[in-house]
Amino acid sequence: MSRLIHLSFVLALLACLTGTISANPIDDDRDRLNQLLSNPEPADDAELLRNTQEAIALYKKHARRTLPGHQVELDLDRDIRAFETENLTVDGLPIQGGVWDLIKKGADKVPDEVKDQAKELAKTTAKALFNKLTEYLKKKISGEDAAKKDT
């Protein structure tokens, strides 16, 4: 019996030392959202894409906790689907090969001015989606935190 008690204390000590147990995941999400918001103008396109994808992940984590059918969530879901189909990535990197090689070859024939306009449109779309998501998440996470404190 004493071995069992000793083993349980050792396991409890190991759990405390690893620090992997989070006391409040909403606080963690709020901290991550604040990190995303602390840099309103990302340094490059890759950072903008990464920040938008992280905001999407936070949205997917918190949006499903509401009743279905809210117009705000429906609009954001539609915008996210459009963004994800236009910005296909694997492990955070743009996909390569296959059909995309054919598209890239065809894109070589497109004037640079059109490419620049398309790139600016993609950046503007990503920024708009990022802003919509972060505004939604600020309200959502603050509301969940307030509701949790009331209980």
From Swiss-Prot:
What Pfam families does the annotation carry?
A: Turandot
Localization, per the record, is: Secreted
Q: Has the keyword Disulfide bond been applied to this entry? A: no
Q: Name one GO biological process term.
A: response to oxidative stress
Q: Tell me which GO cellular component terms the UniProt record holds.
A: extracellular space
Which keywords annotate this record?
A: Immunity, Innate immunity, Secreted, Signal
Kindly indicate where the leader peptide sits in this chain.
1-23
Segments crossing the lipid bilayer: none
Has UniProt tagged this entry with the keyword Secreted?
yes
Q: What does this protein do?
A: A humoral factor that may play a role in stress tolerance.
Q: Which family does it belong to?
A: Belongs to the Turandot family.
Q: What is this protein called?
A: Protein Turandot Z
Organism source for this protein? Drosophila persimilis (Fruit fly)
